[in-house]
Structures are given as structure tokens and as C-alpha cells.
Amino acid sequence: MKKFLLILLLNISMLSAQENEIFLMRFHEMEVSGNQSEFISANKNYFKPLASQAIKDKKWAGWQMLQSVTESNKYVFIHYYNSPKQYETSKDVFSSAVAEKLGLKSPNMNSFEWKTTAPMDIYQVFSVASGNSQSNYWVKNDYKFNDRQKFIDNHKLFAEIVAKQMQKDMEGFNHGAAINLTFEKYENEEMVSYNGVSFDGAASLEQLLTNRAYKENQETNKTWQKIGKKFTDEVEKKGASDFATAKKTTIWRLVDETWGD
């Protein structure tokens, strides 16, 4: 079967994958009290090497640590898996025995406390648009949708039409989208839980905020006018304009990551 390059959602690195493979990501959201610097140091110097070794041992595909820009004591760790089978069989990633083999010194855990603040939901990555530069900041968009296909179609069209131009105009722009596979809650036939997510990257916080800011009397950009019309037309053809009933946006800084290199 023909292979294509599946870009890890929040990373420039590429991996080869079959078209029908199911690539997963799991979120671990937490809140930390105490010494934030010590917490970050523990993850960079102890847990990151263990995560990297787990990739080499094919226990998972990648590890990332993000910190909230607006609430600096909040973090989200993203774990990547090449398949549901890899997720199911992944064990002892942060094993003390492995740490000993690697010569890692246990961090001082007395200077901070952490607690998990949300279910560790598993998402399927279905769309990725990767540029040629690193994203150091991310806009995370959480969505509620009733029609999965509309959500998927809309984001695939965004990746194909809009993201390509964004990558020309904005350094560090990378984009990806995924759907929640492990939790859904309906009330009166309406989705009340967030069941979709997308990420839009930027090289710097300045760039990200500038791109999102309102600009008065901005000149019409004919290129973007044309792209916007094409995107709108294609979305209407697919019937994917009303793809979400709610949206929540947060901004995150990339603290560290490893893909086994």
C-alpha cells in the first residue's frame, strides 16, 4: 500500500505510516503548586530521557510538555502512539529500573505538588499540515460537534487550502486536528462534552498575538481574499460550514519534547 509522510502533530519531524493506520495522542493535563522551575527541571532532566528511551523501545512515538501562557501553573503533556496496539501494550514508560540503567538521578519531588485535572482522553489525529519551521507556541482549540464527518471535512479543507498559505506568511505555523475516541456526552441529542481539538502553531508569542490581533483599516490582501473564497466555496460544497456548536481557545508554550532522537 502506498505510504505517505504522517507528521507528528506538534513537531516538524516526520514518520512513515500506512494510510489506514490510526495515529493516537493522549492528553495528561495537570496543575502544579510550589516551585515551577523545579517541576520543569524534573521533566527536562529525568522524565524526558525516560520518554526518549520509551520511544527507542517502541513503547510510544513521542512526548511533549506544554505550559499555559495565561496560567503558568497549568501544564499539558501529550503522549503519541503509532497505533492502538502500541497504546495498549505500552507499559512502564517511567520505570525506575530503566532510570537506573540510564544513570538518571531521581529529582527532588518535595518542592512541588501536582494533580491531574482532566481525564486522560485519547484522540485520533486525522489531519496535519506541517511547515518547515518549529512551533514554539500553540493555540489549542477545543470543539464540541454533533457531526463528526463535518468536523473532519472542515479541518481537512483548512489544512489543504488555508494552512499552506499560512506557512508562507507566518514562520512556525503548523496545524493539526484530532477527534476524541474515549469520551462523549450527549444531552437532548446535543453534544455537551468537547470531542474535537485543533492546534495552530507559531514561532514566537509575539507572532502569535500579532496574528490574532485586530487591525484597523487593514488593507485588503488579494491573495487571502482569493484563498478565503476558495475555502468557503469548498466547505459549502462539502456541507461542512456548521461543523461545531462550541469552541474554547487556550494558548500554550512548548517547554520540551522528544521523538527518540
What are these regions (language model features)?
Residues 2-3, 26:
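Basic side chains
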Residues 3-13:
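Sec-dependent N-terminal signal peptides
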Residues 17-100, 104-261:
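Short S/T/G/P-rich N-terminal loop/turn motif that feeds into the first structured element of a domain
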